[in-house]
């Protein structure tokens, strides 16, 4: 039997495998709230423009609300034979209100309908991601404020480089998340145009009011070109791009948590709430939450790559290939949502181990740059000369197996006779971080001010 929504031209129904590959209801049913919102706005516009009689409009609106209630309660039965969410809703609407339901699709195609549904869903989800990223920022800033003066090693190449503070390290991720939130908002602003009324690809001959439906659905304006309206999914690509970048940031932080919680580092502890055990090794406490965030970033990045590949060879306007925009987009954005929530929980659960952090901060000659800076500042050496002197002193200390602060003044003066005992003031890790007072530097006073600024800003924004 042919599909009664479009089957007039067909003498028989599709093959079973055709029905299976063609159907999207298994995943696009999550668009039901957006689909019904779009239909309510569309039918209201059809009534206001006189295209439909008010009696039909009222019946359709009441029927759509009944369908919505059935879906929300779990009473609705989705049928694969009806392909997608649009036809499932319309079929049930016809059962409820009769032939008037067939008027709902006046001046509309599934092409502009699904483009509208997807924009609404992505817009809603970007708003949720923005709020979740803000919550993670808040958790990071709160922890940073508590540990503004907790010294830890800063790394390059995963080798000890210069001392920083734990709070300063966390605030780096607050800044990254701020840019992520900016990308979410930028993507939202660009997608906030309404395709409804573009119809299949060429517009419609009915005297519709696209500005009215756009306004009713919270869009800034209708899309300006009917072909573009139904032919592109760059709004989903942009959202996925923003999500992928955010996922990379979360993955990097998750990797650090995995490293920091290891026995070899011991920088931080996670409670039982965010760790798991081993089925064979009773001593294990595995940072599985962090590892899963790290892994799930790959799914988000993969969804972006997948949709780019789907779209790259499609001529205008709509092709069925574009049905493949949904699963990856749904999964990626909801995966990022899960990861943001998990990271916020872990940040609030993290317990730094100050003695381990401080001990590591002083290892690996991490104050060598402070020594070089002292030679420049106090003795007037060009920085390159100071760099060489410091390098030779590091070599002396390494040969003895001690830190720079353990070298005698005589040993230092053997490399640079003008060095005085005042040099020892810059070789402690606390003095090192306290001296980094440049804007954006790791000095505890800077970190406190930045954390407080962020907490104030986050309390004032949605």
Curated annotation (Swiss-Prot):
PROSITE patterns: FUMARATE_LYASES (PS00163)
Keywords on record: Amino-acid biosynthesis, Arginine biosynthesis, Cytoplasm, Lyase
InterPro entries membership: Arg_succ_lyase_C (IPR029419), Argininosuccinate_lyase (IPR009049), Fumarase/histidase_N (IPR024083), Fumarate_lyase_CS (IPR020557), Fumarate_lyase_fam (IPR000362), Fumarate_lyase_N (IPR022761), L-Aspartase-like (IPR008948)
GO cellular component term, pick one: cytosol
Gene3D superfamilies, sorted: Fumarase/aspartase (C-terminal domain), Fumarase/aspartase (Central domain), Fumarase/aspartase (N-terminal domain)
Alphabetized GO MF terms: argininosuccinate lyase activity
Compartments, as annotated in UniProt: Cytoplasm
Gene Ontology BP annotations: arginine biosynthetic process via ornithine; L-arginine biosynthetic process
Catalytic activity: 2-(N(omega)-L-arginino)succinate = fumarate + L-arginine
A Pfam family assignment: ASL_C2
Source superkingdom: Bacteria
EC numbers, comma separated: 4.3.2.1
Disulfide bonds: none
Pathways per UniProt: Amino-acid biosynthesis; L-arginine biosynthesis; L-arginine from L-ornithine and carbamoyl phosphate: step 3/3
Membership in a protein family: Belongs to the lyase 1 family. Argininosuccinate lyase subfamily.
Protein name (database record): Argininosuccinate lyase
Organism: Methylobacterium nodulans (strain LMG 21967 / CNCM I-2342 / ORS 2060)
Gene name of the record: argH
């Amino acid at each position: 039997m042919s599909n009664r929504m479009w089957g007039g031209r067909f003498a028989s129904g599709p093959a079973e495998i055709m029905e299976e590959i063609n159907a999207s209801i298994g995943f696009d049913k999550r668009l039901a709230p957006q689909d019904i919102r779009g239909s309510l706005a569309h039918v209201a516009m059809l009534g206001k423009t006189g295209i439909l009689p008010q009696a039909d409009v009222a019946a359709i609106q009441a029927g759509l609300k009944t369908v919505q209630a059935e879906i929300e309660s779990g009473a609705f039965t989705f049928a694969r034979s009806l392909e997608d969410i649009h036809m499932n809703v319309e079929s049930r609407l016809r059962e409820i209100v009769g032939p008037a339901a067939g008027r709902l699709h006046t001046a509309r195609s599934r092409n502009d309908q699904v483009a509208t549904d997807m924009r609404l869903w992505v817009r809603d989800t970007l708003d949720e991601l923005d709020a979740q990223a803000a919550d993670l920022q808040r958790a990071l800033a709160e922890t940073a404020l508590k540990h503004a003066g907790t010294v830890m090693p800063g790394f390059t190449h995963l080798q000890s480089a210069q001392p920083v503070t734990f709070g300063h390290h966390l605030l780096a991720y607050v800044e990254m998340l701020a840019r992520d939130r900016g990308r979410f908002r930028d993507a939202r602003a660009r997608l906030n145009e309404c395709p409804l009324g573009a119809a299949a690809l060429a517009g419609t001959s009915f005297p519709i009011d696209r500005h009215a439906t756009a306004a009713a659905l919270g869009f800034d304006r209708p899309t300006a070109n009917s072909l573009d309206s139904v032919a592109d999914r760059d709004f989903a690509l942009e959202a996925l791009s923003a999500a992928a970048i955010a996922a990379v940031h979360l993955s990097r932080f998750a990797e650090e948590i995995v490293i920091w919680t290891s026995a070899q580092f011991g920088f931080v502890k996670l409670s039982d709430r965010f760790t798991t055990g081993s089925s064979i090794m009773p001593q294990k406490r595995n940072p599985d939450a962090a590892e899963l965030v790290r892994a799930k970033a790959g799914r988000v990045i993969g969804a972006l790559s997948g949709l780019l590949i789907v779209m790259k060879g499609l001529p205008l306007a709509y092709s069925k290939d574009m049905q493949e925009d949904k699963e990856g987009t749904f999964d990626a954005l909801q995966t990022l949502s899960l990861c943001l929530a998990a990271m916020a929980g872990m940040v609030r659960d993290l317990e730094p181990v100050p003695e381990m952090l401080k001990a590591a901060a002083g290892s690996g000659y991490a104050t060598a740059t402070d020594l070089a800076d002292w030679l420049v500042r106090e003795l007037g050496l060009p920085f390159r000369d100071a760099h060489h002197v410091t390098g030779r002193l590091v070599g002396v200390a390494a040969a003895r197996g001690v830190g720079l602060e353990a070298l005698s003044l005589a040993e230092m003066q053997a490399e640079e006779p003008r060095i005085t005992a005042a040099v020892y003031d810059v070789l402690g890790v606390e003095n090192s971080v306290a001296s980094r007072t440049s804007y954006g530097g790791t000095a505890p006073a800077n970190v406190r001010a930045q954390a407080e600024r962020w907490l104030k800003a986050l309390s004032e924004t949605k």
